[in-house]
Amino acid sequence: MSDTPETPLSPYIDHTNLRPDATAADIEKLCAEAIEHELFAVCVNGSWVQHAATYLEDADVSIATVIGFPLGASDSDSKRYETEAAVDNGVHEIDMVMNLGRFIDGDHKYIVREIRDVVEAAEDRRVKVIIETGYFNDEQIATACQLAVTAEAHFVKTSTGFGPGGGIRRPAHFKPFGLP
C-alpha cells in the first residue's frame, strides 16, 4: 500500500474524437462521457465546436479543437481563420499542427509567424503546438520546441497520432527546456 495520496486523473484528461466520420450523436456521446467521468475537456474537429459548446453549456468541461489537422500543411492565414471561427463558436483550447514542410525547409520565421498568428487569434485561450516528432531527429525537435516558445505557445505536443511512430520518442529532446 502506498503512502502517497491518490490523485484523481480525470481532471487531467482530454477526451477526443477527431474521426472524419464523427456524427452529432458521436459528439454528444463524447460530451456525455466527459461529464459523467468529470474529464477536463473534449477535443473535437472544428465543425463540431459549436455543437459541443451547446451540449456542454452548463457543464464544467472545456472544449478543445485542432487547427491545420492532421497535416499542418494549410497556410497560416487558413490556420488563423480556423482559430477565429473556433473562438467564435466557444472553444477553450487550440491544438495546432505546425507546418512540417516549412520547418524542414528551415523557414523558421514562417513557423514563428504562423504560431503567433494562432496565439493572437486564440485571444486568451491556451494554444498547444503539435510538432509531429516522428518526422524529426532530437536536434530538430529541440528547435521546433524553441520556436513554439518564441512564438508564445503554451504547450508542445508530440504527435497527431497520424505521423510515423506516433508520439513515441526518447525524452532527451525535452531536456533543454528543463523537463524531466
Kindly give the residue locations of the regions a language model identified.
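Alpha/beta enzyme core
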Residues: 3-37, 41, 47-180
